[in-house]
Curated annotation (Swiss-Prot):
Lineage: Archaea, Methanobacteriati, Methanobacteriota, Stenosarchaea group, Methanomicrobia
Record organism: Methanosarcina acetivorans (strain ATCC 35395 / DSM 2834 / JCM 12185 / C2A)
A Gene Ontology BP annotation from the UniProt entry: 'de novo' IMP biosynthetic process
Reactions mediated catalytically: N(2)-formyl-N(1)-(5-phospho-beta-D-ribosyl)glycinamide + L-glutamine + ATP + H2O = 2-formamido-N(1)-(5-O-phospho-beta-D-ribosyl)acetamidine + L-glutamate + ADP + phosphate + H(+)
Annotated positions binding Mg(2+) 2: D101, D253
The protein's name in its UniProt record: Phosphoribosylformylglycinamidine synthase subunit PurL
UniProt keyword list: ATP-binding, Cytoplasm, Ligase, Magnesium, Metal-binding, Nucleotide-binding, Purine biosynthesis
């Protein structure tokens, strides 16, 4: 039901009581999910322009200039609530929706990433959600032939009952084929093409704009869409062919609010109105009413604006691909949104009011009571036990069980496969892109502003170790109930942190999604603030890319960046049951210089290996690089007054490990940033020495700890 405050505004504008169909349109298009009514003022603080940005926020996806006449389409979406209610279909249709966003811009999807967040797997419900969500992503992505090349998987008890499924998609096309969702000309026809329209997904947009109740699995299942990847593949090919032949004047995929959302937004963006003939829509079920036809979120559907003379050609294309298609309306000069059904007018709304009239506001924001730092844990007597415990944490352990279910090599562009800091794809002969995603939710929980900044730095470093120059950022801003002042304060400060650090690095934030009300009645939890981002960069493939693992016996190991003792939000503190203690490490002022230096070091072509340091710090980073060969490392010179566990597990941002046969070859590049040669690659063990500790772990022990998640899931 529409809130009474909204109804008052609507009655005043219309001068009458809205019809049932009109109420449905407003309920969905004025929902938080569609209108960003709580977040719009904050989103405007992002810098979204740049020399390579052709289309920024506001369309189905952003368009970034690449090379040789090619452009990249990039978008990011969430499908959180549906993935709790029906995890397989919720995750699958999350993939389908973001892929259609890319297609609607005229681009062929070439890559996916999936930042995912779950509750602990020792709870049967969380384990079920985890398994089904991964299956849903794999089942849909593999069938449509788009590789999943990178991702993040993070576990925390606060995601119990409210997993987060975020998806990034990237597409490629020639600049002349870019299509937008801005309508072009009155009297042009609106063609609905793809799957037929059923009753699935009704109210999906409004469902995504409230907390999950204990009865959500039963009550909200009709709000979850059901996907068909084989139809999606046909829709993809049909749409791209129609665009390449010049038939499509504007295009929008049908997602939130279904035909009602797509047709009204497309028309309004071009300053036009629309008249929809609901009876003309190809229907999957008998006796559907106008409300259902207009607002169902059935998947695999696209809306095209087509000139009258091209209608027959487009419908012939639709038939060629064995899809459903029909003219369902037309654009009008009058700026109204009119829906006809059964010969009667069931909706007649000023279109700008429908698509842009939702009242936006900044919610009350209140900082929480100042948190006590708490007591840091004593340094463990047996450091090796702590080391292996951290390494076997599912947040750090190998995610091989996940990405082995994905086809990450389809389309034959993949240069760097999943399991490294970033995925790399070949675009043209010598140019490629690097892709990375994620954030650090525990750091953002303790310090939202610094957590937002850290997300930008962490992803920038993931690109840097592959020599990639950042091009653009997209985001999924996942938070709890914004009506709680403390939650809105978290949201506000995380957004400001993201924006400030992105500006400092001159990376535009070109699009994304806001997902609020992520709270679970069943588990009595609210998610930690999760400003998940996707980042894309340009890579020169003429230069040999360093491996994320030690690759050459005898290489010198260089640590770049400063290690600080702040441990707040760290995986080590979580493993030691001190999760709320400590201060979050600050992003260093010289982070841009550190990132630039690492990029230049990689571009020198001299590095054998390079790896960003994040969760688990130096200890976990070294262990991860010891996949097939060991290392001897001496951290004594770095220690100062730092405790052994802080030295090993600090997650101070903007640090990396480099391996090179001749360190002098990059000394000039690194001369203006903190760095030190800390050891050599070789042997069958990882040996780490500090001022007052020595640690020796065999490659077998490392492999066993690092394989904990795979072993559990295969168990």
């Amino acid at each position: 039901m529409l809130p009474e405050e909204d109804l008052k505004i609507i009655r005043k504008e219309l001068g009458r009581e809205p019809t049932l169909v009109e109420q449905g349109c407003f309920l969905n298009l004025w929902s938080e999910h569609c209108s960003y009514r709580s977040s719009a003022p904050l989103l405007k603080t992002f810098t979204s322009t740049g020399e390579n940005v052709l289309i920024g926020p506001g369309d189905d996806a952003a368009i970034i200039k690449f090379e040789d006449g090619y452009v990249l389409a990039i978008g990011m979406e969430s499908h959180n609530h549906p993935s709790y209610v029906d995890p397989y279909n919720g995750a699958a249709t999350g993939i389908g929706g973001i892929v259609r966003d890319i297609i609607s811009m005229g681009a062929r999807p070439i890559a996916l990433m999936d930042p995912l967040y779950f509750g602990p797997l020792d709870t049967p419900k969380n384990l079920f959600l985890f398994e089904q969500i991964i299956k849903g992503i794999a089942g849909y992505g593999n069938c449509i032939g788009v590789p999943v090349v990178n991702g993040e998987t993070f576990f925390d008890r606060r995601y119990s009952g409210n997993p987060l499924v975020n998806v990034v998609a990237v597409g490629l096309c020639k600049e002349e084929n870019v299509t937008t969702s801005r309508s072009q000309k009155a009297e042009n026809k609106l063609i609905l093409a793809g799957s037929s329209t059923g009753k699935d997904g009704l109210g999906g947009a409004s469902f995504a704009s409230r907390d999950l109740s204990e009865s959500a699995e039963a009550e909200d299942r009709p709000s979850v869409q059901v996907g068909d990847p084989y139809t999606e593949k046909l829709v993809m090919e049909m749409t791209l062919e129609a665009i390449e032949k010049g038939y499509v004047k504007s295009c929008k995929d049908l997602g939130a609010a279904g035909l009602g959302g797509a047709s009204s937004e497309l028309a309004a963006k071009g300053g036009l109105g629309a008249r929809i003939i609901a009876d003309a829509v190809p229907q999957r079920e008998p006796n559907m009413n106008a409300y259902e036809i207009l607002l169902a979120e059935s998947q695999e559907r696209m809306l095209f604006e087509v000139a009258p003379e091209d209608v027959d050609a487009v419908l012939a294309l639709v038939q060629k691909y064995d899809l459903n298609g029909a003219v369902v309306g037309y654009l009008t000069k009058e700026p109204t949104y009119t829906v006809e059904f059964g010969g009667e007018i069931v909706a007649d709304i000023p279109i700008a009011f429908l698509t842009g009239g939702a009242p936006t506001c900044e919610k009350p924001s209140e900082a929480p009571t100042l948190r006590e730092e708490g007591k840091k844990p004593e340094t463990p007597e047996d450091l090796k036990v702590a080391f292996l415990k951290v390494l076997s944490s599912y947040n750090i352990a190998s995610k091989e069980w996940i990405y082995r279910q994905y086809d990450h090599e389809v389309q034959l562009r993949t240069v760097v496969k999943p399991g490294e800091d970033s995925g790399v794809l070949r675009i043209t002969g010598t140019k490629g892109i690097a892709l990375t995603c994620g954030c650090q939710p525990r750091a953002t929980l303790l310090d939202p502003y610094n957590g937002g900044k850290t997300a930008i730095i962490e992803n920038s470093m993931n690109l840097a170790v592959k020599g990639a120059e950042p091009l653009a950022i997209v985001n999924c801003l996942n938070f709890g109930n914004p009506e709680r002042p403390e939650t809105y304060w978290q949201f506000e400060n995380a957004v400001l942190g993201l924006g400030d650090e992105a500006r400092k690095l001159s990376i535009p934030v070109v699009g994304g999604n806001v997902s609020l009300y992520n709270e679970s009645d069943e588990f009595k939890t609210a998610i930690p603030p999760t400003p998940s981002i996707g980042m894309i960069g340009k890579v020169d493939l003429e230069i040999p890319l360093p491996s994320g693992f030690f690759a050459k016996d005898g290489d010198s190991i260089i640590l770049v960046g400063e290690t600080t003792p702040e441990m707040g939000g760290s995986e080590y503190y979580a493993c030691m049951d001190s999760g709320n203690a400590g201060m979050v490490p600050a992003v260093p002022e010289n982070a841009p210089e550190l990132i630039k230096a690492i990029i230049e070091a990689v571009k020198s072509g001299k590095l054998s290996s390079a790896h960003d340091l994040s969760l688990g710090g130096i200890g976990a980073g070294l262990a991860r690089m010891c996949r097939s060969m060991g290392a001897k490392v001496d951290l004594s010179e770095l220690a100062g007054e730092t405790q052994a566990d802080e030295l090993l597990f600090s997650e101070a941002p903007a640090r990396a490990l480099l391996a090179i046969s001749e360190p002098e070859a990059v000394r000039e590049i690194l001369k203006d940033v903190p760095h030190a040669v800390i050891g050599k690659v070789g042997g069958e063990t990882l040996e780490i020495k500090g001022k007052n500790f020595e640690l020796s772990v065999s490659l077998k022990e490392i492999a066993e700890a690092y394989g904990s998640l795979t072993r559990f899931m295969m168990g």
